[in-house]
Amino acid sequence: MSDSQAKRTLPRMLISLLITLAIGAVWFYVSLPAINLHNTGFYSFVFILLLVYILVFMIILGVDTGHQEIHLKDYLSFAKNQCKIVVLIVVVMAAIFVVGQLISAPIFRAGSYHELLDVGTGDFATEIEPVSFDEIPMLDEASASVLGDRKLGELSDMVSQFDVSADYTQINYQGRPVRVAALEYGDFFKWFLNTKEGLPAYITVDMVTQEADVVRLSDLGLEGMRYSPSEYFNRDLNRFLRFHYHTYMFSSAHLEIDEAGQPWWVCPRETRTIGLFGGADIIGAVLLNASTGEHAYYDVKDIPTWVDRVYTASLIVQQYDYYGTY
């Protein structure tokens, strides 16, 4: 490349880079990929951004393809000649992705998948305490949802503004088996009208008595829930987590309440223990105060005792299937 060509190309290269970074920032804000080589979504994010850069650079440079439309061969030819470093990055990341898939495959790592779940021998008589009949849960999640919706419908000041989340978490609250669910904003306009104070309550359903209750946070001397999945912009739960924990991969967050009735989002942190992408397991959790946004990360062994669920049932079943299959 001659000096004159370099002087003409460099500013346009920088402009292309700035445009790509702007597009990437917006896309990151929306898609929220974990910046982690164990996360397959991170590879997609990087690949597409690199391809966007090549396309933007090609358009700004004013490449003459000889026809109105840009064909695939034009794109590939331009990338090969003008974007060698970008192409090299794509090739390297593609190689990492493919190798990562291979070294994570059960066909090559069957023993590792078998050992993922530590299975020991226990004594049922000494380890399982008897439960009285009035402590046995009698209600599944679907039934709890019906009771919760019905209870919210009785409250004229809330039913027109809020819905009940479909996610009812089973917990032990003050010695009772309870399902708890957050409220959600009915739509964007109802969010706009209520977001300053936050969600004013949550739903609890006693799994033994089948009694549903709307717990108003103001009655407990607590602030409304300002951080939740139904929030928009920076107080959206997943976005808040991503901006504070850029590299963490999270399992599905769920609502729990401590013994004082304060709602917390329990956000289990996932890792991959086999190769790059295999052997999902939980190594800790972020606890986020739904009212104040206060948050902290805990390793599994340090998680407060009032937290009832860190491992999901689906993950345990998956690991048990690996144990039996391999």
In which residue ranges do the predicted regions lie?
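Soluble extracytoplasmic regions of secretory-pathway and membrane proteins
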Residues: 2-326
